[in-house]
């Protein structure tokens, strides 16, 4: 018998299978559309991705230094279900996945020999160190933050408050019983979809590396053939499906331990086969470099390279200023043409100095943040599931610090070997200074003796390849990790076979862990869903991975990651507040205990047709609430006036305040509705909308303060964005007390 939340499962399935069908039917159109979505998000929300990661980081570090670190995920007398090795291996295998092998060499080489200048660079040694540091930044503390945040919130709320293990439960301290309706179903559906897209991003990236590794061991395997990649996806999906059917302890736990152990043996085998002292030096230096620069990198939004990209676009100059004549003004007509021409001039580019490619933020940092965030529901819930009996402090240190340090060691070792090989090849093959420009990162692969597909073509490059060395910047990215173990003679084949096994096992652990979490959410936290449900979610992941691989490769995979990460970024912001309230409740915080948990009515009741099971006895009937919301959409005067009077404002000033806010709303609507208004007028309309939000948020704050209702100003601003519902809520609150109405 199925145990499933049909609403959440149907919503998630519709989104996932709708996307799969769309991609398979229209590969070109879907790829183009995903690229357009990605461009819009990166143009408008780069600042949000960057600042939220840093704020979450500060919040988690703060918790580690407070009394809240001693709160246990479970009963106070409960002991952990897994020992440290099992716990760590499952976290690492689930949280890092196949990406560690895909990017550990490819990413540093891309920075080392690419248009990247994020840190001060005066020579090639510093360019090499920058490449390692940027890689650590993308795989470091900022990446694990979303995981830990979700894990702690679910662990505290579910294990100490008896809530089911689903993502909706993380918001219980914030929204109470309202999460049991359609709002909670939507959260779980979003979590399932985000998890599946996030896992399939890794699967889409990993299958290319698997195909390349198989080709290296058996030349009959075509690494570029879609049929080969699809076969790999479904074979591994079948194994992952078997693992998830066996369950957490019998399948996932054992597979994770094997996967982690193989990776450990491979890593130390490579260290011993190479120069361990060089690699240890690189690790220590890279750790110091990371600590030195992580703050600057963490707040970097690529402001100036992005502005230069606009300047290079002759059709985009009007975005730089609001000229009185718009696109017909001097900026658009004259400077656009001349400026774009000047920016292609080598002398001007030299004068501006070494620059970072304007696509760096989209291709790398935002892709990573979207990718980590899209994995957060899945990995965070998985960590919470295996961390029962441990404290908040243990989760932060064990799931935040330990995996990061071990990941740094892995990335530094493999990345350093890649850069060392690149340098050796360049020194051996360079015949003129122009072959390699360390300042810009440009490499002339033809002069170094490589074809477009990365095959050595000259006597020098062929001889170098026989000795196991390649100019990696001229090679296919999927072969980088295989190339760096070529110099080790007879051990090379063994290492490459171990790499293939490790990648496949990481592929499986990511897939089975993702399927397990999808099962858990769709079954409303029931820990042993029927086999049919497990098979369904595993097959959905396989189908989505196939769709991503066949629709446009890495670019589409990266785009989907960024798009999926955005909505869950907003959810994680609310989760921070929810976790904070849950922890304060554990210590019976006096100020929090004396406050009301919410307004008399909830804005989310609209999702239940204004007939929620949690509606109080004093809540207005459905007709009253519908009329109030519709009226406030266009005429907020009465609601604002009542709310201001309810907080003690003089009736005259309350009326003036209501009139001003109503005027702001009508101005915004008028400008947006005007067919003659240009882009500038529409921008002014949005400015008036922001003013409206500011005004309503502050009125809501005053109402909360007068009624001693729990909340904060950020919640008020979020509520004010849906101003008809927020105003109706305040109006009903005022009317509930005749003395203040």
Where are the language model's segments positioned?
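Membrane-water interface regions at transmembrane-helix termini and the short interhelical loops
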Residues: 1-3, 27-42, 63-80, 131-138, ...
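Transmembrane-helix boundary/entry motifs in multi-pass membrane transporters
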Residues: 1-7, 41-47, 76-94, 122-141, ...
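Membrane-embedded translocation segments of transport machinery
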Residues: 179-504, 526, 551-553
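Helix-loop-helix module between adjacent transmembrane segments
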Residues: 3-4, 15-23, 57-59, 96-100, ...
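Intracellular leaflet-associated regions of eukaryotic membrane-associated proteins
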Residues: 1, 593-741
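N-terminal alpha-helical transmembrane segments of multi-pass membrane transport
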Residues: 1-127, 245, 577-583
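Hydrophobic alpha-helical segments of multi-pass membrane transport proteins
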Residues: 15, 48-65, 263-274, 406-417, ...
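Flexible loop linkers connecting adjacent transmembrane helices
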Residues: 32-38, 65-84, 109-134, 156-182, ...
